[in-house]
Amino acid sequence: MPLDYHALKSRPIAELEHRYDARDTILYALGVGLGADPLDAGQLRYLLERDLVALPTFATVLAYPFMWFDDPRWGVDGARLLHAGHALRMHAPLPARGAVFGRTRAVVVSDKGAARGALIVLERTLSDGPGGAPIATQTMTLMARGDGGFSAREGNGPPGGDAFAAPRAAPPEGPPDAVVELATLPQAALIYRLVADPNPLHADPAFARAAGFDRPILHGLCAYGMAGHAILRAYLGMDAARLRAISLRFAAPVFPGDALRFELWRTGDAVRLRATVPARAGLLVLDAGEAELG
């Protein structure tokens, strides 16, 4: 069954409440690399129940309908779906424990052709309850590699689907003014999936091979959370309340065990960033990064 344009666009993909406790908040922080120095007070504020603080990027895993693409109504080939980019804007601090309400909907479904696949942009809003005060808004850009050509089917959306032009940030100029190096554990994806995305692409070697990878890859949002950690460390004294927004493009897969080198440029409250893997010939894995500080 081909991707169903009207099914995706006509209704929310999910509306759900997500209850979480201190253990979930701490497990997420461990999953994105905090705790490497267990004596660092800046890291411990996200790892100890007393006066616990939630990382802003924890919002990326809350009230999200993981494995939504398994629902046959959408006609999406989940095995060939890749996360291409993510943007998060915080409207209020995320509670360290409690409940949030999330609404996820497809705002763009674009047909790039049978050979190139389709592009899907999901928007998710988080609030403190249905119709409540907003906490965060985020967009997730997905490449549906197996779903191109859907608009050739009569009545399945406008020709080419929705128009979409990805925003392109100009590359930073000059050397970075801050560099943060963060390692990932070989078991990083296995830890992260306990509180986040259970997609077998990140845990099952056979599934990863079927998707075209030699082995399971690290979740894009795990690397994204590490980028947030790098910003907090470089500029904000590990103060989560001052990270207002962050967006990134996933340029290449990160593998568990990779060490990431984050390069950052700051102008006022605006930050540009990218990440490479030095041990893989300096491969660029996170690109076009932008953040807003408060």
Where are the regions that the model predicts?
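Hydrophobic, proline/glycine-rich low-complexity stretches
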Residues: 1-101
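General secondary-structure edge motif
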Residues: 8-9, 68, 74, 127, ...
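Phosphate-binding glycine-rich loops and adjacent basic patches that engage nucleotide phosphates
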Residues: 21, 60-68, 145-147, 152-153, ...
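Catalytic-pocket segment enriched in acidic/His residues
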Residues: 202, 206-283, 290
